[in-house]
Amino acid sequence: MGLLLLLVGIGGGFGAMARFALTQATASISKQIPLGILLCNIIGSLIIGMMAAFLIETKLFNEDVSTYVRFLLVTGFLGGFTTFSSFSLDILNLLQRGEIFIAIGYIWLVS
């Protein structure tokens, strides 16, 4: 538990710094639309879906390494990078488990 918490913290810190850097870099492009956050959410959600599929479909990592990679990169970095990726992953997991009505209810409650 302690190592996983540390991995999430390290990944989350770097993800938050990356989000801050992207929002600062795009701040002068658009004053009306929060372009940086929009890009973070789009990029992060795309990567989180690709990482989830990659970790599920490939046998590149054993289960222990896959867990560490997931906590560092998906939960940590992408969770810190986006404000939407954790929600997307929750919906993806519910749909993969066949819990369609719970996923719809979750979307309705959060929206």
UniProtKB/Swiss-Prot annotation:
Its main location: membrane. Na(+) is not transported, but it plays an essential structural role and its presence is essential for fluoride channel function. GO terms for molecular function: fluoride channel activity; metal ion binding. Pfam families: CRCB (PF02537). It is a multi-pass membrane protein. Fluoride-specific ion channel. Important for reducing fluoride concentration in the cell, thus reducing its toxicity. This is Fluoride-specific ion channel FluC. It comes from Francisella tularensis subsp. holarctica (strain LVS). The gene is fluC.
